[in-house]
Swiss-Prot record:
Subunit text: Heterodimer of an alpha chain and a beta chain.
Superkingdom field: Bacteria
An MF annotation (GO) of this entry: L-serine ammonia-lyase activity
Co-factor(s): [4Fe-4S] cluster
UniProt keyword terms in alphabetical order: 4Fe-4S, Gluconeogenesis, Iron, Iron-sulfur, Lyase, Metal-binding
Cofactor: how and how many bound: Binds 1 [4Fe-4S] cluster.
UniProt protein name: L-serine dehydratase, beta chain
Enzyme category, top tier: lyase
Catalytic activity: L-serine = pyruvate + NH4(+)
Pathway: Carbohydrate biosynthesis; gluconeogenesis
Listed EC numbers: 4.3.1.17
Family: Belongs to the iron-sulfur dependent L-serine dehydratase family.
Signal peptide start-end: none
Amino acid sequence: MLQVFDIIGPIMIGPSESITAGAVRIXKI
């Protein structure tokens, strides 16, 4: 999971909404 966040971190660098959307995507996976 840490690796996934490490990749999404730099890509989803933005507002909290973007980070939340990324978290939801991880949950979907």
